[in-house]
């Protein structure tokens, strides 16, 4: 417990900052991931083969690739894409992307694949008879979505979204490759300096 002392005598300050970084990346990634998941679910449930194929391809590939590889691809590939776009507009200087932004996007891309499956299953759990009954009552699409579909999807999805939150929190231990110091990286740093676990 000596490591958790605040000030010069311990690592408490550093652990607190690293914990806040872990929570910040997790919360931002979960929010962005849910937004991407909603778009992915929409692409999967509409009657368009192309969007369904793209959404299924995205979720299958990202879930099948190791999370660390996804982070590397977005970290290094993101810089290359931004530099290429900048060169099109005549800007030839080096552009370095913010590590927090890259880490958030990478974890969100991973989180979105799992969240989309949870939300899609929750949507499919709703009886089609309820939607037909709402149409028979004269409700428009927006009313049906916000008054009939959304409350039930949220209720069905909450347990699964809790599991996705745990996956997202776990995956933040990989973001140290972008240069951010999160809780696991900070514990390794303190262990190496103190020569004790």
Where are the language model's segments positioned?
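Transmembrane alpha-helices and adjacent helix-loop boundaries
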Residues: 1-197
């Amino acid at each position: 417990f000596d490591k958790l002392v605040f000030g010069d005598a311990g690592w408490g300050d550093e652990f607190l900052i690293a914990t806040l970084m872990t929570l910040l990346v997790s919360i931002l990634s979960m929010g962005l991931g849910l937004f991407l998941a909603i778009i992915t679910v929409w692409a999967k449930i509409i009657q368009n083969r192309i969007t369904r194929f793209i959404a299924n391809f995205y979720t299958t590939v990202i879930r099948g690739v190791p999370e660390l590889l996804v982070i590397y691809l977005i970290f290094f590939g993101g810089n290359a894409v931004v530099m290429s776009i900048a060169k099109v507009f005549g800007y030839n200087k080096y552009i370095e992307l913010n590590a927090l932004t890259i880490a958030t996007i990478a974890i969100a891309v991973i989180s979105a694949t799992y969240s989309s499956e949870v939300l899609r299953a929750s949507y499919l759990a709703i009886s089609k008879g309820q939607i037909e009954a709402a149409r028979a009552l004269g409700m428009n699409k927006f009313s049906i979505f916000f008054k009939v579909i959304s409350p039930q999807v949220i209720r069905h999805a909450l347990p699964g979204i809790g599991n996705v939150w745990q996956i997202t929190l776990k995956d933040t231990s990989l973001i140290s490759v972008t240069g951010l110091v999160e809780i696991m990286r900070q514990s390794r740093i303190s262990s190496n300096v103190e020569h004790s676990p």
